[in-house]
Amino acid sequence: MKIAISLFLYFCFLFSYSIKAEDIPYLLTASSKGDIESVKAIIESGGSVNTEDGNNVTALMYASRKNQVEVAKYLISKGAEVNKQEIDGWTALMYASKNNYSDIVELLIESGADLTITDSDGWTAYGLAATSGNHQTLDLLIKKGINPNTRNSSSTTVLMLACKSGNVPTLKVLINNGALLNLKDKFGKTALVYCVNKNQIKATKFLLVHQPEIDSLDKFEWTPLMWAVKKDYFEIIKLLVEYKANINHKDDEGTPIIQYAVENESVDVVKYLIEKGVDINVTDQYGLSPLVYALKTKNKAMVELIRSAGGEY
């Protein structure tokens, strides 16, 4: 009886707008809401199980991104294309992984979902789970055979993305399952740099315990500490120095770390670096010392600090 009523309402809706059935994504709405009776009514009356909206999002995708397990099971049993991709390359598995719906994820994988399919940015469901901090889904995907060192089109690893979000439980899952700490993206940045650049203090602490390369160089010969100083992330700076980061490093242009702190007018950072033994008279590619740059800023406290530490022109 419920099926008959749902079917009647469905066709009333169609004819009231005088448009073709295939133009009405009613199946998608029902799938999203978990309205299994309406979904069955539409499919059993001849509706396509692979109906799409204008962005090629299918009913299975609608069900997957709303954790509608019963609807997803039914659609799959009726021949829904598990690996269908929408306009941006997302699959039902990607939607479920992004939202940490592990029951849907497991159902899709058991139904033949391809773990290696990538979206338009080069990411698999695995990467999308990592960016969302969904460590339960990550763990499941790894157990199903995904490579923990999967990269996207920019050679960014899942560990790097997890560092950006700063989700420590996710980092634990990745590292415990073989994610490599010192891999580099196309710019030469490691996972540690990703943590540093987003000022992820807890994630940085966690990563440092696992002994990544502390002075890894990117394509411009910047180290994690140089990035932290440039961005004036004092807590991160202290963490890196505690783990023996080189405070006297220069980038590929010959600019020393302390110069970035001086230009930022970060008096506390400069004071800290001095206390840790930085070369206060180091010069850059132009032969200019930190004192010269301090004078340029006209920051009296900075000038006095550097002079009191023995800074010269």
Q: What kind of region is each of these model predictions?
A:
Residues 6-15:
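Bacterial N-terminal signal peptides
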Residues 17-27, 144, 177, 210, ...:
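Ankyrin-repeat-protein effector appendages
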Residues 21-62:
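N-terminal segments that cap or nucleate solenoid repeat domains
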Residues 29-34, 62-68, 95-101, 128-134, ...:
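Ankyrin repeat A-helix N-terminal signature
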Residues 38, 70-71, 103-104, 136-137, ...:
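Conserved ankyrin/ankyrin-like repeat signature
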Residues 43-48, 73-81, 106-114, 139-147, ...:
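Ankyrin repeat domain, specifically the short helix-to-loop turn at the C-terminus of the second helix
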Residues 49-52, 82-85, 115-118, 148-151, ...:
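Ankyrin repeat boundary signal
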